[in-house]
């Protein structure tokens, strides 16, 4: 970005900031939070950018606020590439009112106390009964991979993802795609795809299963697969999806399209009929 703006003598009305994920093999000389004069900034570039160094092969929590945190790790491709993990902060557990209200009614307690219980607080009733609000629950996790034929470096960060976005560049589709070469097999297509730094749907499905993902979104399809709405294109994309399903097993598999939206429901540990933690007092 910096060089592109400099070479084209472009000036911007506002400023921008660049935080760079540094690989161990990157040229030496720039360390984390290097002084701005040593970095040849563009006039529109903020000096607040950071060089973020790897720790144990990963970039952990390169961004964090009260809602989400973002971590990253390299993925194997023909050139340096990165995958990202977006973690939602723990959220307050859901209250099932019917499990608490009887205790409040029995002791003549103001129902407004439910607000405190919903916040996860512990309250003591008039007879000494202690009601504990629901604990905070893990937030959602989304994994977004770039080009890759092996994303194993991100596996630890990606465990139990609610959704993983994984490329599926090429596929062997006999009987569906009339451009299939007679000599090709599932194995030969996978080896050729890997040699170019990419993945097949089966590879995506296997990795999603390995990390315990709940949903798999396939993307980065070869341009030979148009993804159109005609019957032939739909059949091809469904065949690609089924190849991933066969390896992934349980969970949802979707062939992504541009501008597609997906809502990931919040995690809820509350089981139907499960009693809250109630400690009877001695009063």
Where are these regions (language model features)?
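Active-site metal-binding loops of divalent metal-dependent hydrolases
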Residues: 75, 146-148, 168-170, 204, ...
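Binuclear metal-dependent hydrolase catalytic cores
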Residues: 1-144, 151-156, 224-283
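A short, acidic, amphipathic alpha-helical segment used as a generic capping/interface helix at domain edges
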Residues: 150-151, 196-210
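Short glycine-rich, flexible loops that bind phosphorylated cofactors or substrates
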Residues: 172-173, 225
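Helical hairpin unit composed of two closely spaced alpha helices linked by a short loop
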Residues: 172, 187-199
């Amino acid at each position: 970005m910096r060089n592109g703006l400099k070479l084209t003598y472009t000036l911007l009305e506002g400023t921008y900031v660049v935080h760079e994920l540094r690989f161990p093999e990157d040229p030496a000389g720039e360390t984390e939070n290097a002084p701005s004069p040593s970095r040849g900034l563009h006039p529109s570039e903020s000096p607040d950018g950071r060089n973020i160094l790897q720790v144990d092969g990963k970039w952990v929590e390169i961004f964090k606020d009260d809602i989400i945190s973002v971590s990253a790790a390299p993925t194997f491709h023909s050139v340096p590439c990165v995958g990202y993990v977006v973690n939602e902060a723990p959220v307050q557990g859901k209250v099932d009112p019917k499990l608490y209200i009887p205790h409040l009614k029995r002791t003549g307690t103001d129902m407004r106390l439910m607000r405190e219980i919903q916040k996860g607080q512990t309250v003591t009733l008039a007879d000494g009964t202690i009601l504990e609000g629901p604990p905070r629950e893990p937030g959602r996790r989304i994994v977004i991979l770039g080009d890759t034929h092996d994303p194993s470096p991100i596996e630890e960060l990606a465990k139990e993802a609610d959704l993983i976005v994984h490329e599926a560049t090429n596929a062997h589709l006999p009987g569906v795609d009339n451009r299939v070469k007679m000599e090709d097999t599932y194995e030969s297509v996978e080896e050729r795809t890997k040699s170019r730094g990419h993945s097949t749907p089966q590879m995506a499905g296997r990795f999603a299963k390995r990390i315990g993902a709940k949903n798999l979104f396939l993307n980065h399809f070869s341009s030979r697969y148009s993804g159109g709405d005609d019957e032939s294109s739909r059949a091809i994309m469904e065949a690609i999806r089924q190849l991933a399903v066969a390896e992934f097993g349980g969970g949802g598999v979707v062939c992504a399209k541009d501008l597609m939206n997906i809502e990931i429901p919040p995690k809820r540990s509350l089981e139907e009929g499960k009693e809250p933690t109630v400690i009877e007092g001695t009063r």
